[in-house]
């Protein structure tokens, strides 16, 4: 059952009965930590609202737009006709043909900030419910005769059009000036779809029109937070019975190509088809698509990939030449295109192609931001602008390039449906392996193992407690009401959107780094929300596939942002843990969250001391090999050599991280990766060799019994602790019925562990000053025409006029992605190449200087391992080293056991919950 905060009578989902409405929570059974009372105390600053109240029907009624159809029905399009044919102010439908009839009642009343801008409409003038209201496919603008006079009739005389002013650039044939009226300064147009596209999909027969025959364009001239107050609206609220949006899906993109975009959209389309196929569901079913809106938000008009934009045009969600730079002197901040598409996508050999889809349309919003303002600003448009209008139940966040499973979005939604206290959820993020081919790259295999282990141990553990430290922005979902701020303007979204202002002098460096992982801040704020009891859940049944870096330079840059953001966000969450006590969670839940924060603190401490811990383990193991019973002098020599190389490589990491670009130092970094792999192989050999020798010595002296495995200190400290960790990894993977990564990626991950600890951590902490997302500054976009106000409240717009012109424009867009794109080459500019050369020379000089002085000090002081060749060694040093080794390794084993128990609890709960 879906929770509809507006009170619409939506039924239950399948056989589940928990109600999402806080007034009906007594329908579920009580459970520990979930008493039968409201999941959120009454603290909603906004009363339930409607936008453009309409009669109770599902008919697409007239809306404050003007058609740019070539047919002269719109106000200002054919004044000769209007002078001789005065329309009836109250026709058989809701609106008159002449907007002046509604001018005073609808558009010129003084705006009162205390009242919702869409609530001042008189409903008394509307007729009673009619049978025709149930038809979705009715005119968007529909007077008695929706299109005015028949342009092909004998008595029709078309008014001459005004040619545009000549310009040096070639003028497109289809651009013709039309006059349209602005509503409260807002330019909104209904643009006809190209006949070439329209002929492939079901739609209203002429002269009718519907959401399939026209695309709606809005030129937003405001900040996202003011979108609702500036009286902008969306199609879903313009039906005679406004459509309830149960699922609002955001797809954010920057400059992703058409292949990545199509991969995501194909996954979204399949999920919508799946929900439409659930005919026995009381929430979904045949018309499920009417409750789902997909919003594609592109970060910057100059940044969008032209092939991706062409794919959107192929879907009917974009038309070239419609957008404006300014409206009435106000800069346009976002271009919003709305269309219900019935066109599908498919990928063949790395190429995108269109295919007709039947029975399951998709309501789409394409928001093309004028400027590049980063991903968090895109989410402001999604939540503050469009979410405020649509008032959805569940919001799903996707990155372009992430492909959700065919029913993954449904399973995410289901988690909210069965648990009224679920405020956020995420699925499993999988590495896209191309049928295993990418596993040949050790870097990809290592990341695959890392992702799998997180989904098997970390996420289930955190879900069992109710707080997941991060819901990945690439694929996650939130309950819209859980995100809302309180009446004082404080809450999850307020904290989340602070990240947009965290630049330069506006924020400290700690806060700026913290907001590199703003999704972690959002998770903490939801769980600790004042007077609420929201929880975060992991949904194993849901998954999304994504690409991972396959080159070292890209990998380092990605992890720099991840590591810095997650570390500082974890510090923030731990330092503000006390805010959990202001929430309305039960005492038991608060205690569980307290235990989880202790666990998070221990993890953070291990991350902070990661470099030191790894070096000490290396030093102790190599020192063991120098014993006379093991390798003797050979072990001592190898230990000193490896220790010098280890420290030299570590210093090189620091020098490169402080001054060099990873892309310009790729050879250095790859050399270090190979060295760390060699170190890991040597450590593995040392651990096994030391253990075997210690067991052999035990057998020769006293014989062998099973208890000797636990009394032999070296064996117990090394093999049992490490072995138990790896055995738990295998066991958990088999229990979760997902063990293949243990056979295909385990060795690669183990070999890359020193690289993760040393290279990535050093680069991240040496670049805490860099708070960028790795994107460059704005490119200059092509300047668009402006819409300037004329006497009478009208503006001139350039519009497509002719079926042939519309088809030509549509086919030109299709041609942009008809062929495979040229293979991308990373071309380094001459400036970057010269800068890399200078920095490389500087780093080489610094390294030679440091190593020469270090060698001099080591030789003079007999330090840095040279003392190993002396016969005078203290046994206490070995004792301390052994104790330290045991503490570190058993701590690792204990943490793994803790994760394992949490994962088992998650599976137990999942057996009864069904999600």
UniProtKB/Swiss-Prot annotation:
Effect of loss of the gene: Leads to elevated spore production.
Reactions catalysed according to its record: [(1->4)-N-acetyl-beta-D-glucosaminyl](n) + UDP-N-acetyl-alpha-D-glucosamine = [(1->4)-N-acetyl-beta-D-glucosaminyl](n+1) + UDP + H(+)
GO biological process: ascospore wall assembly; chitin biosynthetic process; septum digestion after cytokinesis
Protein's cellular compartments: Cell membrane
Principal subcellular localization: membrane
SUPFAM superfamilies, alphabetized: Nucleotide-diphospho-sugar transferases
Broadest EC class assigned to this enzyme: transferase
Highest taxon of source: Eukaryota
GO CC entries: cell septum; chitosome; plasma membrane
Record membrane topology: Multi-pass membrane protein
GO molecular function, one term: chitin synthase activity
Annotated InterPro entries: Chitin_synth, Chitin_synth_fun, Chitin_synth_N, Nucleotide-diphossugar_trans
Family, per entry: Belongs to the chitin synthase family. Class I subfamily.
Name of the protein: Chitin synthase A
Organism of this sequence: Aspergillus niger (strain ATCC MYA-4892 / CBS 513.88 / FGSC A1513)
Gene expressing this chain: chsA
